[in-house]
Amino acid sequence: MDAIKKKMQMLKLDKENALDRAEQAESDKKASEDRSKQLEDDLVALQKKLKGTEDELDKYSEALKDAQEKLELAEKKATDAEGDVASLNRRIQLVEEELDRAQERLATALTKLEEAEKAADESERGMKVIENRAMKDEEKMELQEIQLKEAKHIAEEADRKYEEVARKLVIIEGDLERTEERAELSESKCSELEEELKTVTNNLKSLEAQAEKYSQKEDKYEEEIKVLTDKLKEAETRAEFAERSVAKLEKTIDDLEDELYAQKLKYKAISEELDHALNDMTSI
């Protein structure tokens, strides 16, 4: 009789232990289900973020295309301006040669060239005006440098956002590993949930690989944009320098032509005076 009571007590104890294990397994199952749902929500959120990343990459592609077009236009403008400079240099050479010939004819009237010195003073004042314009152009370049710094700041902000996404992915992976460790302690009823967790893990790793790939593509686009921006800035600088050279050469040509015309008038006046003097001497 005592043996039967003892056996019944053991059976009762086994029953209570079995109930405790069942409750624990049920609790673990519920926790795994909750964690699985949370991971699925995180997966959906991450997919949305990746979609946003793809949109930003498209914008970078458009920006790269625009930068290439601007670079081509600036290089064409610089080439045209350099051609104009060469043409103006040839015109200056011809005008200078003609001026040299005029100065040789006016060698006997050097005493009356004080007015030419005044014209040189006016040319110096004109050069000062050109220098003031150059200073304004330098201020414009400084403004463009400020705008470029702002663009770099925007790019750095984009890098910071991608680093934040990568950090969150690392946190999610850590949470997932801890979830897998707890899931291994569950009873056989949790096996199906474990398979689902493995699937979610694979999806997260795949998404992480995609995020890394997009990050590398973005870095490449940013580097290409930076190179093209530097080339564009160089081409614009060449074009601005060529334009300033053209303006300066045109002003020089105008001054030389004015001086040549004035010298011709002086030569004509001196010739007339000499003719009058010769006529007076002949009359005497």
Curated annotation (Swiss-Prot):
Pfam families: Tropomyosin. It is found in: Cytoplasm, Cytoskeleton. Residues 1-40 are annotated as: Disordered. The lineage of its organism: Eukaryota, Metazoa, Chordata, Craniata, Vertebrata. The keyword Methyltransferase does not apply. Residues 12-40 have a biased composition (Basic and acidic residues). Belongs to the tropomyosin family. Residues 1-284 form a coiled coil. One of its GO terms (molecular function) is identical protein binding. GO terms for cellular component: actin cytoskeleton; cytoplasm. SUPFAM superfamilies: Tropomyosin (SSF57997). Keywords: Acetylation, Actin-binding, Coiled coil, Cytoplasm, Cytoskeleton, Muscle protein. This is Tropomyosin alpha-1 chain. Homodimer. Heterodimer of an alpha (TPM1, TPM3 or TPM4) and a beta (TPM2) chain. The modification N-acetylmethionine is found at M1. The molecule is in a coiled coil structure that is formed by 2 polypeptide chains. The sequence exhibits a prominent seven-residues periodicity. Binds to actin filaments in muscle and non-muscle cells. Plays a central role, in association with the troponin complex, in the calcium dependent regulation of vertebrate striated muscle contraction. Smooth muscle contraction is regulated by interaction with caldesmon. In non-muscle cells is implicated in stabilizing cytoskeleton actin filaments.
